[in-house]
Amino acid sequence: MATVIWFVLAHLCQTMMMENRLKFIEYGNPIGKTVVYFHGAPGSPDECSIFDKHGKEYGLNIICYDRLSAELTLQGKGYYQNLADAIKDKVNDGKVDLIGFSIGCHVALETSLYLGDQVGNLHLVAPAAPLVEGNFLDGMAGGVVFSLAMNYPAVFTLLSYCQSLLAKLTPNLLFKILFASAAGKDKELTRNRDFENYITPILKSCFNKSLKGYIRDINQYVAPWKVRINECKVNTYIWHGASDNWSPVGMAKYLADMIPGCKNTEVMEGFSHYSCLFESAPKICQQLAEESQVIPYDAAMPNY
């Protein structure tokens, strides 16, 4: 009888662990070298789909965890440790490269510290730097949102729920509001129906399914984290649009100066936020493939 009870309890514990395990979406080459992508906020794992073609071309298995769905009890260090544990479950003792976009760069950097020397390279695309450093808020398109999160968190939460309502009822209006101040080549993207079809489901997913996770990410971003930057000694590469008004280019320069492991910063003239992501994606994949000497997707598939 005791054996049966032990077996049932063990099965229940295993089931609970499986249910709490972070889900992820993968793109590119399923048997390629693992690269973990950290989407922006707002954002969702589907944001990573732009890497699918490039991942296949360069033999990379690019995955994105649904981190906004993580247990809401996970805050601060526990949140980043949980992400690191999920990545370790995937790669075991192997090496992994990380790519962060926008606020996802903050999460990627924090998580890298819990992965230690398992991280080969860290690529930060349009990274958002700590707001307590520099005069960044005035030059940010979303400066009001971040200012509310820092100074009036209850009002920020209320605003987020209003955005959630828009995402449910009129997602196209939410798209227009968020991109009303688009600059540089992001302006061209906003007139592209394919881009709207790409980004609208991402916004709906974030503000509907993962709203509380989004609020957590923003709250953790606006809190002080400068000291963590000084601990990032992994090989780091920064990609930034010169016309970015979501993450002003000064943020890239600040991070390049503060990250001990920063190897290179590429500032792309005319590019802004999402346009920088689209432009840098194939370049990042090519660089990772050349460093790892991985096999392209077609060449890796067996012939029958």
Short names for language-model regions:
Residues C232, I238-H240, D244:
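Short beta-strand/loop motif that positions the catalytic acidic residue
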Residues G143, A149, F156-V227:
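Alpha/beta-hydrolase
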Residues L122-Y161:
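Flexible "cap/lid" loop of the alpha/beta hydrolase fold
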Residues Y80-D97:
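Conserved acidic catalytic loop of the alpha/beta-hydrolase fold
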Residues L22-L72:
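Conserved HGGG/HGGXW glycine-rich cap/lid loop of the alpha/beta-hydrolase fold
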